[in-house]
Amino acid sequence: MSNAQAERTVPVSMSSLPGEQVIARWEATEVVLVSNRSTDALRELAERVARRAMLDTPFHTPAYTVADGDPEVRIFVAREGGQAIGLAVLRPRLRWGWWSWDDWDDERRPATPVAPLPSWTVEIIWTHPGCQQRGLAMRVLEVASDAVQQPISSFGWRRPFTPSGEAFVRRMCPEGFWVPE
């Protein structure tokens, strides 16, 4: 096993931290909300999880770092058994178009431009490879949707998608998806 492959199997340790805000619980899972108003320790943890998640995606930069100056960014970290097992990073962005799945499949640009409208955008939705196929990504996104008070179907979605990410977005938004600026 290569070092890169080994890194992908190691979860990020996540014990309870002072000041954390647990916003959802089910079975053995908790979701902790982190923002730029959270403690340094929580923001550093969110960055470690975002860097771990980046290993499983086509992105070259993490969806969140401590240096992120966006006061509105929201990071949702799923914890189970003292390990971070899921992540959703949302931030408000202007959306400028609707991409139908027909246009996406035919590699056409979004056919329906819209006036720029602020909308929460999913920068990343990730679950640890050992925790996939359990509905965790959907549960974390539902928690995020409740927290930002916006339906999942109206979120913008950052691309590119992994194959499993595209399948997930197709399930969440069967007609198509909003494209952020």
Task: List where the protein language model places each region.
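Glycine-rich acyl-CoA binding loop
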Residues: 133-141
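Non-catalytic substrate-recognition and accessory regions of acyl/acetyltransferase enzymes
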Residues: 1-129, 143-181
